[in-house]
Amino acid sequence: MRFLKSYRGLVAVTLLVLLVDNVGTLLVPTMLANMVNTGITTGDVDYILRNGLYMLIATGMASGGAVLGCYLSARLAANVACDIRNAVYDKSLELAASDFERFGTGSMITRSLNDINVIQQAILQTIQLVLPVPFLAVAGIIFAWLIDPAMGTLLGVVVAIVLVAAVFTVANAAPIFMRLQSFIDRMNVVLRENIVGVRVIRAFNKELHEEQRLDEVFSDYADNAIKVNHLFVGLDSSTFFLMNIAEVAVLWVGGNRVGAHAMQIASISAVLEYALLILFFVMMAQMVVLTLPRAAACLNRAQQVLEIEPSIVDGERTLGDGAPASGGDADAVAEFDHMSFRFDDADEDTLCDLSFACRRGQTTAIVGSTGSGKSTVAKLLLRFHDATKGAIRLDGVDLRELSQDEIRGRIAYVPQKAWLFSGTVASNLRFGNEDATEADMLHALQVAQSTFVLDQPQGLDTPVAQGGTNFSGGQRQRLAIARALMKHADLYIFDDSFSALDFKTDAALRHALQEETRDAAVLIIAQRISTILHADQIVVLKDGEVVGLGAHDELMETCEVYRAIAESQMKGGE
C-alpha cells in the first residue's frame, strides 16, 4: 500500500516494539514454571529471587511494549488515514463534473469519511491484534513443546482447528460486508435527499412515502448487519467452546502426565497459559479479520476514486505564450468558434455550432427558454467540460491548451444557485481575493448593493450559515456577486444571478456593474429580458442553437424567438 511507504520507519519501530511486547509476554509463563519446579520445590531462595527479577524485567518489557505499541500503531493508522482522505479530496477537486457524477455526492461523502474511518480502524486493529498472532502461535507452541512435546502437539492441533473455523467464517463474511457498504451509500443518498428537500416533501404531503422509502433502505442494511452479527455470535461461541475444550484437554492430559511422572505440575500451568494466550489472540484476530473484507471494500472504493483518470486534462500553454489562433477576434476575451458540445450519455448535441465573442468593455447576454443550454455555456467557459467540436478560446488560446487553474484565475463566476460557505461575510468575500483589505470588501459590497451587511452588529464578521441559509435568496445572490467582484477578473459570468432581485435593486446593481467591469468582458445569462435590455449583444438560444445575435432593438425586429420571449414577459407585467 503506497500510503504506508511514507511511514516505513514508523512501521519498523512499531513492529519492533510489538515484538518486544510479545517476547516479554511469552517468557513469563516459562519463568514462572521454572521458579516453581526448580526454586520453590527445592527451596532455592537465590534462584527464586534471581528468576523473580527476570520475570519483573520480562513483565516490564511486555507492559512498556504494549503501551508504546498502542501509541505508535494509533499514530500510524491516523497518519495513513489522513493521507488517504487528503488524496481522495485532492483527487475529487481534479475531476470534471462528469467524472464526479459517476460516483454521486452521497457516495463521495461516504468514501471520504466513513470508508476511510473503517480503513483506519482496520490498520490499527491489524497491527495490534492480527500481526502478533503468527509469532505468538508458533512461538507459544514451541515453548509448550519444549516444556512437554505431547502438550505442545496438543496445543498445535487445537490452534489449527480454530484457524480453520476462522478461515471458513471470514470467507462467508466477505460478500456480506461488500453489500453493507453499498447499503451505506444508499442510506446517505436517501437521507441527504430528505434533509435537503424537506420543504418539498412537506409541501407535497409526501412524508409517509419518504418514511416508507427510508424504512426500505434501513431494513436492507439491518438485514445484512444481522447476518454479520450471526457470524460474530457463531464465531464467539465456537471459539469460547474450543478454548474451554483446550483448557480441559490440557488439564486432563497434563494431569495424567504428572501422575506418570512425565512432567512437573507447574509445567501444566505454563502450557495452560500459552494455550489461553494463543487462543485469546486468535479469537481477537478472528474478530478483526471478519471486518477486513469490509475494510478491503472501503479501500477498493477509495482506490476507484484515486485511479480514475480525469476527463479534463490540463494543457501546457499559458496565456500570452505564443501567438493566438489565426482568424480569431483580437478584442475578444472569450470566443466560441463553431463550438458544439454533447454530454457523454447524450444522443444529441446540447449546444450546436455556437460562434460569438465576449469582448473587453462589452456586455454579452445569453437568453433562451429552459433547457436551451444557457448554463452549459458558462460551464464550458470554466472548462468543467470540453467542447466536442470547434473551439473555445480565452485571449486567443484554446481552453484545451491551458491549465484549469489559469482559466479559472481569469474568470469570476456567479453560479445560478448562489452558494455561501459557513464562516463570516469577510471569509466568503476573501474566496475571491485572499489578500483583500477591509476597504476592498466594503467597495465590493457597495457595488453589489449588499450594504445590508453593514447594518448588522458584526458587519463584515457577520456569521454565515452553511449555504448562506441565514440570508434571503436575494441577499445570497448579492453576496455571491460581491465575492466575484473581489477577483478583478478579465471575464465576469453571471449565470441567472439577478433572478431573486427586485427590479429596483436589479437596475441599481447593473448600473454599478457597468463602471466596475468597464475593463473586463461581462457575460450575463438571464431569463428576464429587463436584465439584458442594455447588453451590447444578446445571443438567443433555442434547443442549443443560436437563432439570434444582436442588440435588443435589432432582435425585436429580426428574431421571432426573442420577440416571443420579450412579449410574453411584457404581457406578464415585466
State the predicted function of each range:
Residues 1-6, 108:
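A short amphipathic helical element positioned immediately N-terminal to and/or at the very start
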Residues 5, 11-68, 72, 145-150, ...:
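Transmembrane helix-loop-helix hairpins at lipid-water interfaces of multipass membrane proteins
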Residues 6-9, 97-98, 114-123, 127, ...:
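An intracellular "coupling" helix at the cytosolic face of ABC transporter transmembrane type-1 domains
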Residues 20-24, 56, 60-77, 158-172, ...:
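Hydrophobic alpha-helical membrane-associated segments
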Residues 42-43, 78, 86-110, 114-116, ...:
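Short intracellular "coupling" helices and adjacent cytoplasmic loop segments at the cytosolic face
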Residues 44-48, 139, 143-160, 164, ...:
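Helix-loop-helix
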Residues 322-574:
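ABC-type nucleotide-binding domain
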